[in-house]
Every structure is written in C-alpha cells, then in structure tokens.
C-alpha cells in the first residue's frame, strides 16, 4: 500500500475524457444504470457552465481509484462577497484505498477550492463522520415528515398547480438558474388569498414486504418561498400535496419555523463554509436533479 500510494495523483475533472473516465468508474462502483451515466455526461456541461471543472478524481498511475462529482448550485452573496456553491456528490473510493487516502482526497478538495462553499445532502453514517472530522458542519435544520394516512382527514380548499420555473422568486442573496431535473416540480400552493411557491423532488423507490415488491413514492420539499406559512398549514398542505403528487410520504426540512406537534426527524445535510453566519443551503440545483 505504501508503495502504491507514491503514485497517487489528484486531478480536476475538466475534459470530456476525464468526465467519461470518472463516470465510468462511479457507474461500476455504485452500480448505476447506464442512462444515469449518460445523463450526467450530457447535463454537466450545462450544470457546471460557470465552472471550468466537473469534480475531482484520484489516480494510481493511470487507474481511477476515487472520484467526486460537483453540481454547481449557483452563487451566494455573503458579506458583499459572491461565492460559488458546489454540491459534492457520488464520493466513491476503490475499496483498497479507503481510510487515509480518502481523507487526503477530501483535504485536497477543500484546499484546491478554498474559496468555494461545499454542500453534501446524501452522506451515509460513515461518510458523515469523516466529513464532520475534516470541518464540515451539520446544517441547522429540523426535518418533518408525514405519511398520507396521517394527513388524510385534513380537508381544505387549498389549491395546487404546476408553474413555470421562471415564476419562482428565489432569495435575493442567491443567484441560480433553475433546471428541470428528474422528479423536480415547481408548484404554487394557494391558501385563501395567500400564495406559496415550492420546489419538490419525487423519488420512486422499490420496497418489499413479505416478498411482495412495490413502488414507494416520496416527495421532498427542497425549497419554499414562505417557510412560516408552510409550517402553519403543514398537515393541510401535506394532504393536498401528497394527493397532487401521488405520493405516500412528504418530507421537509425547516430552518427556523417548525410545524406544531410534528416529530423532529434526523437529517444528514452538511456544509463546509468558513463564514459563521451561514446555517444552511437549500438543495436546489443539487444532485437531486439527477439522482434519487
């Protein structure tokens, strides 16, 4: 292992060839279906058009042994400074190189892109511990979730409709170009004379009970124009939204408001930023646009 580590090279994924090599490695490691790989390769030039790279990889001689993909979420203005937000996704290392080489790989990422803000929305327990150890922080969020059976009697005159992405009004300090991703919808919720805008992500996961397989459909609210209103009318909105999206479960992360009597669930959203005023970044234009 010591001898092999002398040949390790850290590289930015810039060219089409680099991207193809990294995606081929990740497809094999994560056992993706080929259409996911094709989607990454076709979408990344658009997603990362304001960057000149698509991620990083590590090679031992000429063999890819680790890779991380980047999704450019946009820009955020912090204390009169405009900084890019990068969602790190699909972090995978060859089994023989896990441990210290993995941590060194992450440290390279943070040093090479020291003026960028990094997010991670999909870390498992092991990855979360490693990321926290090197300086990532947990986003200050509380997660609420509700099954359709728990909201079924919350009738209301709330109306929901799909709207064009250009109709959404994202926060003033965020600059981003919204893209139609897989399972992504832009919605308007009308409550009496008030209107609430949402970006949602629908996932269809395969589940099995007593050997019988079925599709488990979950909708996640990844952004809202008015968190206080969403929290106030949580169960009524859930009822309408689950029916509208044909889902069985609704999930949402709240920053300062939280639905009354809702149970707080754990979330695994992380970020790396040297500015103490930032508590969270919504997962808009993140890996959720492509991956489940």
Regions found by a protein language model. Name each.
Residues 266-292:
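C-terminal functional modules
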Residues 137-153, 271-281:
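Conserved catalytic-core motifs of GNAT/GCN5-like acyltransferases
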Residues 57, 63-73, 87, 193-210:
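Conserved beta-strand in the GNAT
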Residues 2-43, 87, 142-178, 288-292:
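Short amphipathic alpha-helix that is part of the acyltransferase structural core
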